[in-house]
């Protein structure tokens, strides 16, 4: 899952958005990704998906740079929960508009000839359980954690 977050300093200076429709009025930190339209955040609230066009003073194609800018109080970021979890728990970042999120998949990639390997099966199952346990992933694979060719 990806969530919206910002530093307490940023929120103190500029306020906290109370609704998704307010995001375009805030400085957002955008990651340039190959397969995604620039500055369009597709967010779910559990029942529906909304697309929102955001802009901001800075953009990067490197997620860790955007993460650091967020910590530095430069704007609102859309980051993977596993990436910002510790910062949220320590108070360095604040989870904003918590009812909204973006789905994010984690893939285990391996060659077809290893699909039936017990080691691969055990490793993938371990990762599925780990991410479910530690990061609240609803489903870490498209087929429920089972391997298929």
Model regions and ranges:
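Hydrophobic residues within well-ordered alpha-helices
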Residues: 23, 69-73, 88
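C-terminal effector-binding regulatory domain of bacterial HTH transcription factors
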Residues: 81-86, 90, 100-149
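Ligand-binding cleft/hinge of the Venus flytrap
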Residues: 22, 39-53
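Paired acidic/hydrophobic, glycine-rich loop segments that form the ligand-binding mouth/hinge
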Residues: 75-79, 95
């Amino acid at each position: 899952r990806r969530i919206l977050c910002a530093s307490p300093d940023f929120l103190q200076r500029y306020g906290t958005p109370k609704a998704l429709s307010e995001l375009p009025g805030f400085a957002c930190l955008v990651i340039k990704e190959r397969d995604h339209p620039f500055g369009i955040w597709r967010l779910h609230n559990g029942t529906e998906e909304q697309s929102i066009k955001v802009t901001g003073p800075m953009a990067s194609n490197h997620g860790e740079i955007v993460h650091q800018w967020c910590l530095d109080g430069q704007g609102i970021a859309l980051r993977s929960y596993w990436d910002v979890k510790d910062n949220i728990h320590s108070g360095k970042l604040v989870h904003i508009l918590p009812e909204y999120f973006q789905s994010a998949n984690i893939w285990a990639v391996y060659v077809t000839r290893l699909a039936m390997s017990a080691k691969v099966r055990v490793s993938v199952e371990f990762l599925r359980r780990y991410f479910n346990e530690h990061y609240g992933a609803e489903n870490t694979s498209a087929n429920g954690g089972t391997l298929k060719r």
